[in-house]
């Protein structure tokens, strides 16, 4: 029991000594030396503090096209040397590193300059590591919402170049000098600058909509601003990302193309169905709905029209032309000889030339001299007979009926009339009413056949116009669809992040100092 108490006392004593050493060190640095966090860590006012910066990307959360905002989860790595925080480890029990609150130290106050929500600083102020050499290392996490101008030219087959621009709003280029982080290559033992955004494969979460193509980092010097200005220098991290278009291809592009090709089916639909205008108007309304959906996903900009917007406008113009064509076709189809007279050029072009060029079948023609057989109902014949009798005068009909009623026609004596007629004349007198009725019916049937034939010619003109527009609209739709979408499919990000710079800014190709 005594041995256990002795061991426990030794552990407590050793822990207390360690804590006391850190407390004594902190008291020595901040109280005895009189550390002032408001003063830059330089021996003289003309010296410049070198601040090194690096960015580790944990997650590309989203890119909101409407707000033009890039949301990222990052770690902002900052390091510098503060000569006032140096100590001899042998004097403080071998303590070589301190973990201090950021409020206790001088900070370069580096912020995200192109933020889009008014939050310039990091979200969480974690502890700062201070080493005995005066080296200060700070790695705070942050969720940044940065401004990213969207180029909608090739949406949804687009790529974007977004930036995270860091600078110090409190100190100018004469007070601090910003650099990219420097590391040492263990193989060559040479130093190099980290000229890219760091991505840890184990801690990085892939984005389902965007693919990172390039992620370079640069220090930018702006000679147009004086060194006394905070805008003279900055460290900018670039994210060149390409959209994964599968979602939009499945949900917008494919339905748009299928609905667009439904518009040409209107030329196959017979005019007598009465559904031609219904079909084409439905297609036009569907395209309008898709255009509204696309406009809600993109920023309200007048700089460019997105690729899918160009296609929808092209389809709407084409469908509008189809609506006009359908109106003309229906007008031709329901024309009659009583309202319109077909001109010779219309007859020659639409009944002779175009049907032959379009390989349209001609209606079967009756042989020369063959009677035209038409189906007529008995009611029609009765109506025509009644029309015949209505043509004759009432006096003639009354005389005939009265003669038949009183038998005068059979009791005519040769004494009161002229000599008896021949048998041919008597037969002619009996057959004349029947022949007149037959001639009237034949005349009417000829007029009806001529009327129907002319109406059929107008129907053939409408069908020819339908077939002609089918052969014209279909290639236009196919070529327009391929041309517009091939522009987007072959829209790739540049092979190098910066035009004119042969360096690719990747870990595999380090530039040694």
Swiss-Prot record:
Glycosylation sites per record: 88, 161
Main location: membrane
Residue spans, topological domain Cytoplasmic: 333-467
Bilayer topology: Multi-pass membrane protein
Single Gene Ontology MF annotation: acetylcholine receptor activity
UniProt cross-references to PROSITE patterns, sorted A to Z: NEUROTR_ION_CHANNEL
Leader sequence segment: 1-18
Residues that bear Phosphotyrosine: 388
UniProt-listed GO biological process terms: acetylcholine receptor signaling pathway; chemical synaptic transmission; membrane depolarization; monoatomic ion transmembrane transport
Domain of life: Eukaryota
Transmembrane segments: 245-269, 277-295, 311-332, 468-490
NCBIfam families according to UniProt: LIC
UniProt name for this protein: Acetylcholine receptor subunit delta
Organism, scientific name: Gallus gallus (Chicken)
Gene coding for it: CHRND
